[in-house]
């Protein structure tokens, strides 16, 4: 009834118009008075009930009730009222009195004593934050906190149909901290709090992996962000360091969100976000102090926190001090709530080390218990520590160091060198020391290296050595827990090239190479990290699980202070017992070249001055090598580049690949966008200058196992620009997550420059962010190999079935690139091939595509293929690409036109020749000539035909007469000279037998196809004249 009355009174006050007059406290019907009258009414009812039963109620004692404040009214006033405890019947409760103002609160270490309404100090074993609350116990999710897992991608189909949903994704309590999800779901840790006055929220966190988005923001009770600013992005921290974050809170309801979203594009596991010690200031008063949690204590009044019990002690809830364990049979970790029995010792409880060399050059193998020692040797099944003291010969000094007769190795003086087994010697004239470090013998930890151990959840291994030397290798130490980070650091103040290469530009300054192996039975991980100028530690590469002995090289291109870090973690799950103590990593050698403070294992040739007396080394100009005969600087030949590893001898100048040329300083090779190819006695000229600007390809979409949609974005800088790498890929995740740095610092950059680079793009709608996200930018190519029509160059091969066959007869041109950085999956680095194809239907920049069988552009993750189709990839036009067409002759003039061959497979180049006119004879003239000749020929043929016909008739007649005459005279020879002349006929013609043919005879013979004489002697035979 009291609560109902309070709500009604409060509701009536809220219903007052905003501009209406306020009710004075002295009015009998103010909300506070209504509450008081309601309380009095309740007491009267209780009294009436008791009197009606005939049983008088006892007077209320202080133990029978407690005080509370009413809700604040619109004037900021409230009343203190007495509330009977449950199951207590009494009478005579104290009357309501005016309470403290609503914004009142006590200081840290104090609480509000409600009887007198004054602040009092907390007693021993308790603590108070005053007007704040603190969450530092994460054995389970504290009351008021909630987990909400959402999937913000817009994929087709209901979320229930996804093979792997987000229902099991949540923040996980880990004892002293809470850990975020590791997948690509969006999980929010939510806490709602109502503040009586302005305050703040403060928490500590560890956030080292930018493959997870980490946001902290605040909403009101209407689910609206209080301040929609970029401050919600939490900054990255270094490995092992706890950062802090605080945000001001407004009075009223504040809903706090810790939200993480994983961006998983590969197989590597991400490091989760860790949060601890959440403190909220500005809440209502506290009327009591909180008891210290088990494992902590408070030994003085007015404490605002409790201290953790040291190791081998424990405490219960509300303890004033810690109780020691029985040290001979029990132990406890720091902050323990109880002691546990010590287990028997096993082989997992000790490790071996090598002592420094003694004066005899011997080292001892020593066995030590893992500290702190928690096992017992006096139990039945316990093992004892193996005997120590076995002596072995010390390994020699590392290259660049020498032994001066003592038990330690010393660096060689400047200008000298040693292989580690002999004394230091001065470099001969014309040479200089090859500075660097080569650590391959591990008897003691080198001076510029240090080792440590830390754990995000406890301090067991603080002060321990994370790594131990072991003769021919250095190995991970025991640590305090299986999830410890075992740290090994190498500090190098800077890098510089050899003297002869001081003027070179664009080349590497040095490199660090190490040989290692891991032996693991669980999910161990080895991280290799680089810190530049002590500002940002970034993970360069990581290896999980057991790895065979292998080498890894990291190239240095910038002169800065570097700290290289190797961090080894056996497992990411913390447990009380040690299960993976035998999981180790071994590093056999670490080599750093061109270190500023390095030592020399050998000497290398250097260039001498031009003067005869000069004996000191001088730097060569860029692109010059050292001539062996004279030790003088000499420029590399054209189209060669200078090796970044050695400059001695002409062989240091390496020829450029096909179709490429060197820069002026011979630092690298590049394509000037022109290419020439001989084909069938024809030279094809290609001009790719219009494609020299960066070409882009957005490929996808693809989806992760959780369904996150992402795209692969490629940038290609094909040629030109004097070899400058114009393709840039950005990481805009780092715009929100990188640590604060000095303005203008270029130690940490969000841009990746290369010939070919790749970014992973997550669209804005995929994760509910306001802009698309670009992450995981990698260099696919930073070295140009060459350009050729062949499909293979330097072990990069384009298979015939990789792309569709070109419909043209113009050969495709191939640009080949590679990356100088090796990875665990690509030991020889990545390589890229770009196939340029002539396609007149693709004007301008054209279209870039990837193989259909490799939608990500690569089939193995190491070699990338692209097909770039454009009209600009066609060869320049020549005289072979057009032909002429002759027009009709008109009025004595003829027009000659030139047209391109179809289909046209060329661009630009030469232009079509202008049409030209030439003199000619018209068709009418030749028609007339032809008609005349034809008519004459026809008349001649008719005349000849008639002549020969008539001639033939006469001969036939004479022949028949001759035959008839011969038969009638029965073989009498003719008496006349003429043949068959009848009476009345004139002897008009004389028959002359002659072998000579006249002109007409020749024509007749041609007509009758006779080859011999026209008239041959014919012997006529008759049966009656056998003698003839």
From Swiss-Prot:
- Role according to the record: Functions as a regulator of the BMP signaling pathway and may be involved in epidermal differentiation.
Q: Name one Pfam family in it.
A: MRH_ELAPOR1_9th
PANTHER family attached to this UniProt entry: ENDOSOME_LYSOSOME-ASSOCIATED APOPTOSIS AND AUTOPHAGY REGULATOR FAMILY MEMBER 2, PROTEIN CBG13728
Say which domain of life the source belongs to: Eukaryota
Q: Which UniProt keywords apply?
A: Cell membrane, Disulfide bond, Glycoprotein, Membrane, Phosphoprotein, Signal, Transmembrane, Transmembrane helix
Main subcellular localisation: membrane
Name the encoding gene, please: Elapor2
Which regions face the Cytoplasmic side of the membrane? 950-1028
Phosphoserine: modified positions = 1017
Give the protein's recorded name: Endosome/lysosome-associated apoptosis and autophagy regulator family member 2
Gene source species: Mus musculus
Molecular-function GO terms, alphabetical: BMP receptor binding
Disulphide linkage map? 292-309, 322-345, 325-357, 673-719, 729-757, 826-862, 838-874
């Amino acid at each position: 009834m009291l609560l109902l009355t309070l709500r009604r009174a409060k509701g009536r006050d809220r219903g007052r118009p905003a501009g209406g007059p306020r009710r004075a406290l002295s009015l009998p019907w103010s909300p506070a008075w209504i509450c008081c009258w309601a309380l009095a009414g309740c007491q009267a009812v209780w009294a009436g009930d008791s009197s009606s039963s005939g049983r008088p109620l006892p007077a209320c004692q202080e133990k029978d009730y407690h005080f509370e404040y009413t809700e604040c009214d619109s004037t900021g006033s409230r009343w203190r009222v007495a509330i009977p405890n449950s199951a207590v019947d009494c009478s005579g409760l104290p009357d309501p009195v005016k309470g403290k103002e609503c914004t009142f609160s006590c200081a840290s270490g104090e609480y509000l004593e409600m009887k007198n309404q004054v602040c009092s100090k907390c007693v021993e074993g308790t603590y108070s934050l005053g007007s704040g609350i603190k969450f530092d116990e994460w054995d389970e999710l504290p009351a008021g906190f909630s987990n909400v897992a959402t999937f913000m991608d817009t994929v087709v189909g209901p979320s229930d149909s996804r093979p792997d949903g987000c229902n099991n994704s949540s923040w996980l309590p880990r004892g002293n901290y809470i850990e975020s999800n590791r997948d690509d779901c969006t999980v929010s840790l939510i806490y709602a709090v109502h503040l009586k006055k302005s305050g703040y929220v403060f928490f500590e966190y560890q956030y080292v992996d930018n493959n997870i988005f980490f946001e902290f923001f605040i909403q009101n009770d209407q689910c609206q962000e209080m301040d929609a600013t970029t401050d919600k992005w939490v900054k990255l921290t270094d490995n092992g360091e706890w950062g802090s974050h605080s945000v001001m809170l407004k009075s009223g309801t504040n809903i706090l969100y810790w939200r993480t979203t994983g961006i998983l594009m590969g197989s590597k596991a991400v490091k989760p976000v860790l949060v601890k010690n959440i403190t909220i200031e500005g809440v209502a008063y506290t009327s009591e102090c909180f008891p210290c949690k088990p494992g902590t204590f408070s030994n003085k009044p007015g404490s605002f926190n409790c201290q953790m019990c040291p190791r081998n002690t424990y405490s219960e809830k509300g303890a004033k001090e810690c109780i020691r364990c029985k040290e001979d049979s029990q132990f406890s970790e720091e902050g323990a709530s109880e002691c546990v029995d010590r287990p028997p010792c096993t082989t997992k409880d000790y490790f071996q080390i090598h002592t420094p060399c003694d004066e005899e050059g011997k080292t001892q193998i020593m066995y030590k218990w893992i500290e702190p020692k928690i096992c017992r040797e006096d139990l039945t099944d316990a093992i004892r520590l193996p005997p120590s003291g076995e002596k072995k010969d010390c390994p020699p000094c590392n290259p660049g160091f020498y032994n001066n007769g003592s038990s330690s190795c010393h660096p060689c003086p400047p200008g000298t060198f040693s292989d580690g087994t002999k004394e230091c010697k001065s470099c001969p004239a014309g040479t200089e020391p090859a500075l660097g470090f080569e650590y391959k013998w591990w008897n003691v930890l080198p001076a510029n290296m240090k080792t440590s151990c830390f754990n995000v959840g406890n301090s067991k291994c603080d002060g321990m050595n994370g790594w131990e030397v072991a003769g021919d290798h250095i190995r991970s130490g025991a640590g305090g827990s299986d999830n410890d980070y075992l740290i090994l650091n190498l500090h190098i103040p800077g890098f510089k090239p050899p003297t002869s290469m001081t003027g070179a530009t664009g080349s590497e300054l040095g490199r660090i190479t190490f040989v290692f192996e891991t032996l693991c039975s669980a999910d161990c991980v080895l991280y290799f990290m680089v810190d530049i100028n002590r500002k940002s530690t970034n993970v360069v590469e990581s290896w999980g699980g057991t790895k065979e002995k292998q080498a890894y090289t990291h190239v240095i291109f910038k002169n800065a202070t570097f700290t290289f870090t190797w961090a080894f973690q056996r497992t990411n799950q913390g447990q009380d017992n040690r299960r993976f103590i035998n999981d180790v990593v071994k590093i056999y050698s670490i080599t750093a070249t061109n270190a500023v403070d390095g030592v020399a294992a050998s000497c290398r040739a250097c260039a001498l001055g031009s003067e005869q007396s000069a004996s000191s080394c001088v730097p060569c100009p860029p692109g010059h090598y050292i001539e062996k005969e004279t030790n003088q600087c000499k420029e590399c030949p054209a189209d060669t580049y200078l090796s970044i590893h050695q400059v001695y001898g002409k062989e240091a100048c390496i020829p450029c690949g096909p179709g490429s040329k060197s820069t002026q300083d011979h630092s690298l090779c590049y394509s000037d966008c022109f290419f020439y190819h001989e084909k069938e006695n024809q030279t094809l000229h290609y001009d790719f200058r219009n494609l020299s600007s960066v070409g882009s390809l957005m490929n996808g979409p693809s989806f992760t196992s959780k369904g996150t949609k992402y795209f692969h974005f490629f940038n290609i800088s094909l040629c030109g620009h004097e070899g400058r790498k114009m393709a840039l890929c950005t990481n805009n995740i780092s715009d929100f997550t990188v640590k604060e740095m000095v303005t203008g610092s270029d130690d940490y950059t969000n841009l990746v420059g290369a010939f070919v680079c790749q970014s992973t793009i997550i669209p804005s709608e995929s994760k509910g962010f306001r802009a698309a996200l670009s992450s995981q930018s990698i260099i696919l190519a930073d070295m140009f190999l060459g350009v050729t029509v062949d499909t293979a160059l330097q072990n990069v091969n384009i298979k015939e079935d990789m792309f569709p066959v070109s419909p043209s007869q113009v050969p495709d041109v191939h640009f080949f690139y590679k990356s100088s950085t090796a990875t665990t999956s690509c030991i020889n680095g990545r390589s890229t091939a770009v196939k340029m194809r002539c396609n007149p239907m693709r004007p301008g920049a054209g279209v870039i595509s990837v193989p259909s069988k490799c939608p990500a552009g690569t089939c193995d993750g190491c070699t990338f293929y692209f097909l770039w189709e454009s009209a600009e990839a066609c060869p320049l036009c020549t005289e072979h690409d057009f032909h002429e067409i002759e027009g009709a002759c008109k009025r004595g003039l003829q027009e000659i036109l030139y047209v391109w061959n179809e289909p046209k497979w060329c661009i630009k180049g030469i232009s079509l020749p202008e049409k030209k006119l030439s003199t000619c004879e018209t068709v009418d003239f030749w028609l007339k000539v032809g008609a005349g000749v034809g008519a004459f020929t026809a008349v001649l043929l008719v005349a000849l035909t008639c002549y020969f016909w008539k001639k033939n008739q006469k001969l036939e007649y004479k022949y028949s007469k001759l035959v008839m005459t011969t038969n009638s005279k029965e073989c009498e020879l003719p008496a006349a000279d003429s043949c068959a002349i009848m009476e009345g006929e004139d002897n008009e013609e004389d028959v002359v037998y002659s072998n000579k043919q006249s002109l007409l005879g020749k024509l007749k013979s041609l007509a009758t196809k006779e080859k011999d004489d026209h008239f041959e002697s014919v012997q006529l035979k008759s049966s009656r004249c056998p003698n003839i």
